[in-house]
Swiss-Prot record:
Phenotype of the disrupted gene, per the record: No visible phenotype under normal growth conditions, but the frequency of mutant seedlings to establish into plantlets with true leaves is decreased under short day conditions.
Name the record gives this protein: Malate synthase
Catalytic residues of the enzyme: R177 (proton acceptor), D463 (proton donor)
Short motif Microbody targeting signal, span: 560-562
Annotated organism of origin: Arabidopsis thaliana (Mouse-ear cress)
């Protein structure tokens, strides 16, 4: 007979965990309503069933990286040509989300959720990924907030303004973005190993909300998701199996869960048909995650000095490789009968400078007109103030049609070649580009370490993608001693030059944020981490993974089973 030994700690509450599951995050009675034994059992079932598949997929990523670092480049897979050439379609788009012309995104914070659902956008993507610093508090409060949002009871009292926020009668449709496959959840151990972050995000949200969501949001479908950071269709296949497993557990029809996949890695652009094929019963399209796509381009070609990017502000949708990526996504999605979603407008209204504000809004207007004329069915905005401009651009072109899936001429996707998708972007590299990367990267990381994953910087709403671009571009420029040719200096980037830039930019940051905020924030710690990342001999895959342990806070295990 096995004995159960309890370690006595008076007045310490514990989560009611099933066998093999240890919750190492802080106990809170509110969190306990999310971390029920039944919900944790469901997450554990997902983890045990799919962890082997996830580990294999991550090893395949590492093997692909080794090939690219040895000189190979991504391309279309000859073995799946039959899928690309085949005459097949994804399941019909649910009526509840046929019209997605403007979507707003943001972290799973309580006030943000209310404002976004009330914003007038068609969809709100609530984010557990790049717009959220995945601390235990942020994650668990996010689940509490989403549960309250789905059942309609969510409110927020802003004491500083003495204002209570609540949901309108008509709200945006809710999509949720879990983390990518590569990120762990170190506060929940399953059979002694950290759980897979996205399975925790998906599992807890689905378990608590699927029934109510299908009544109030999905008209019999749902829940709805966004899936990030995939590099290959095998990763989409895992998600499809997870969805089928969840539908079976819930006793709902196969194909109820629907997801849009972000095409935000360079390898994935060659796998779009295959990704849709694996998710064909659960897909509602693809999205141009263009900022992470630029990050992925640099990371994929980290060992290719002939493929260095110019200043990141010059890598827009006018570059041939970016325009080709967008066009291929549109043609692929419409051929398969699903949404082709456009990219993020990250601008923030500039309230104290009307002239600068109008210039910023004009950039948004032109970008959204370009998207809708190209054939996109909808677009993203980071701020509610941008929604009217985005809506005007799409409605002005689409009229009353909910989307352009059938109305836009389906041009042949095969006309876009590997060469189009890999064409080296043009533009200059400047000292100011190095400075901006450094200044933004350090400030974003400082905010992330203190719990903020969505950060307003220089009139843009930045998330982890910006810090990633800044980091990998600095690393590549230092690694290859790039000549800065855009400002007439003609100097080469070195660790010494970068060190001087870091010192000067830290002084600038201190002046901009003020001495008190600089002293009390984590700017010095962020500076050390960012500098280390930019000057390391080997490039880490993800900044958020490399620094994750700095926000993990374990609490004692109170019950041991021997």
């Amino acid at each position: 007979m096995e004995l159960e030994t309890s370690v006595y700690r008076p007045n310490v509450a514990v989560y009611d965990s099933p066998d093999g599951v240890e919750v190492r995050g802080r106990y809170d009675q509110i969190f306990a309503k999310i971390l029920t034994r039944e919900a944790l059992s469901f997450v554990a079932e997902l983890q045990r069933e799919f962890r082997g598949h996830v580990k294999y997929a991550m090893e395949c990523r590492r093997e692909a990286r080794r090939r690219y670092n040895s000189g190979a480049v991504p391309g279309f897979d000859p073995s799946t040509k039959f899928i690309r050439d085949g005459d097949w379609s994804c399941a019909s788009v649910p009526p509840a989300v046929a019209d997605r012309r403007v979507e707003i995104t943001g972290p799973v914070e309580r006030k943000m959720i209310i404002n976004a659902l009330n914003s007038g956008a068609k969809v709100f993507m609530a984010d557990f990924e790049d717009a959220l610093s995945p601390s235990w508090e942020n994650l668990m409060r996010g689940h509490v907030n989403l549960k309250d949002a789905v059942d309609g009871s969510i409110t927020f009292h802003d004491k500083s303004r003495n204002r209570v926020y609540k949901l309108n009668d008509q709200t945006a449709k809710l999509f949720v973005r879990p983390r990518g496959w590569h990120l762990p959840e170190a506060h929940i151990l399953i059979d002694g190993e950290p759980a897979t972050g996205c399975l925790v995000d998906f599992g807890l949200y689905f378990f608590h909300n699927y029934a109510k969501f299908r009544q109030t949001q999905g008209s019999g479908f749902g829940p709805f998701f966004y899936l990030p950071k995939m590099e290959h269709s095998r990763e989409a296949k895992i998600w499809n199996s997870v969805f089928e497993r969840a539908e079976k557990m819930a006793g709902i029809e196969r194909g109820s869960i629907r997801a849009t996949v972000l095409i935000e890695t360079l390898p994935a652009v060659f796998q779009m048909n295959e990704i849709l094929y694996e998710l064909r019963d659960h897909s509602v399209g693809l999205n141009c995650g263009r900022w992470d796509y630029i990050f992925s381009y640099v990371k994929t070609f980290q060992a290719h000095p002939d493929r260095l990017l110019p200043d990141r502000v010059l890598v827009g949708m006018g570059q041939h490789f970016m325009r080709s990526y967008s066009d291929l996504l549109i043609r692929t999605c419409h051929k398969r009968g699903v949404h082709a979603m456009g990219g993020m407008a990250a601008q923030i209204p500039i309230r104290d400078d009307p002239k600068a504000n109008e210039m910023a809004l004009d950039l948004v207007r032109k970008d959204k007109l370009r998207e809708v004329r190209a054939g996109h069915d909808g677009t993203w905005a980071a701020h509610p103030g941008l929604i009217p401009i985005c809506m005007e651009a799409f409605t002005g072109h689409m009229g009353k049609s909910p989307n352009q899936i059938k109305s836009v001429k389906r041009e042949d996707a095969a006309a876009i070649t590997e060469e189009d998708l890999l064409q080296i972007p043009r533009g200059v590299r400047t000292l100011e580009g190095l400075r901006l990367n450094t200044r933004v990267g350090i400030q974003y990381l400082a905010a992330w370490l203190t719990g903020s994953g969505s950060v307003p910087l220089y009139n843009l709403m930045e998330d982890a993608a910006t810090a990633e671009i800044s980091r990998v571009q600095n690393w590549q420029w230092i690694r290859y001693g790039v000549e800065l040719d855009g400002d007439g200096l003609g100097v080469r980037v070195s660790k010494e030059l970068f060190g001087r830039v870091v010192e000067e930019e830290m002084e600038r940051i201190e002046k901009e944020v003020g001495k008190d905020k600089f002293k009390n924030g984590m700017y010095k710690e962020a500076c050390k981490m960012f500098t280390k990342q930019c000057t390391a001999p080997e490039l880490d895959d993800f900044l958020t993974l490399a620094v994750y342990n700095h926000i993990v806070a374990h609490y004692p295990i109170n019950v041991s089973r021997l």
